[in-house]
Amino acid sequence: MKDIVLVFAGYDQTAGAGVLVDARTVTCIGAHPVCIVTSFVVQNTKGVKEVIFLDPSVIEKHINILDVKPKVIKIGVIGDEEAIKLVSKAIDLF
């Protein structure tokens, strides 16, 4: 089985950054990405219009249901202190 990389990152609809690029990069290095989306970035080729952070309870649900053990955790954009604490909890779990 391939090594698991747990990714916390935002979703960029232009695929120029965030979870889409992270997942592609993880795949390119021969590992398997497991991604938890932390935000949605409303943007186009001219720039970012808005960043919508997911409620920390949604992030927590995704953390709590994980049934794989990541070898690496990659952290991107995190919205607030509560979400940071949840990501820290995930690090402690693994």
Question: Language-model features: where?
Answer:
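Extreme N-terminal starter segment of soluble prokaryotic enzymes
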Residues: 1-6
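Short beta-strand segments
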Residues: 8-9, 36-39, 76-78
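Surface-exposed, flexible loop/turn segments at secondary-structure boundaries
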Residues: 13, 41, 81
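Ribokinase/PfkB-type carbohydrate-kinase core domain
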Residues: 44-94
